[in-house]
Amino acid sequence: MFSGLSAFPLTPFAAGKPDEAAFLRLLRRLTDAKVDSLGVLGSTGSYAYLTRAQRRRIAELAVEHAESIPVMLCIGAVGTDEVLALAEDAQQAGAAALLLPPLGYQTLNEDEVFTLFETVTRHASVPVCIYDNPGTTHFTFSDALLNRIAALSGVGSVKIPGVPAEQSAANDRLAQLRGTLPDSVSIGVSGDASAANGLIAGCDGWYSVCGGLFPRVAKAMTEAAAAGDHQSVRAQSDRLQPLWALFRQHGGSFRVISAAAGLLGLTERDC
């Protein structure tokens, strides 16, 4: 569940509502490519803009059409009660794992974030992935907090932000995390432009926005990493440098991937 390529698709919109037909077209690309898992309703999946009913519907569609590929569903919300309700919806839909970001309006402190994860893992019957995405949550996990949360019995993985641009520094960062996190907790890199560094450094998987639209090239990277072919990992990432440059130019991946999906005819042009 928490290794290889976890592809994070868009939740496309049309006329202000989720475009189910377009969502299924995106899913078909991922199932055809046989990605290792699906990360649905993450930041790329616009979870924060959807109602509970809309999220439940997208969750049901994802699991129904995943063709036995495990689905991880994001349950991020501002209130703990809402998070628990979303967790229940996700599990009823058939989620294999839950992706939990520490979402808040007021800035959260570390004890509050720990309590959130403690509460969710106590109620959940599937493993939880720690979603460390300071770009959207505006909360930064300290290593000490990651270690506290990772020690909870229900935690299965941590989705880390991009690793350092220098490979030696990325190696050091992964070694530091490996030295403190439980062996049972996998480490998945995000921040697509630095995914190659993370995979070469030893991340178990890639939580990938790029993989949600271009799954075959992303899977080629994770498979090369698993085989120890670091030269191929680097070459595949170098091919995508124009895409990484667009991510930097436009303040992240979301707008770029949305535009690309429209240009490919998979979604409305302004999805």
Residues of each region from the PLM?
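Active-site beta->alpha loop and helix N-cap motifs at the rims of alpha/beta catalytic domains
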Residues: M1-T140, L146
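Conserved short secondary-structure transition element at the edge of the structured enzyme core
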Residues: L199-G202, Q241-C271
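Generic alpha-helical structural context detector
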Residues: A7, E223, S258-G262
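A general structural signal for well-ordered alpha-helical segments in protein cores
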Residues: F23, R55, A59, V83, ...
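Catalytic alpha/beta core domains of metabolic enzymes, predominantly
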Residues: R122, P134-Q241, F247-R248
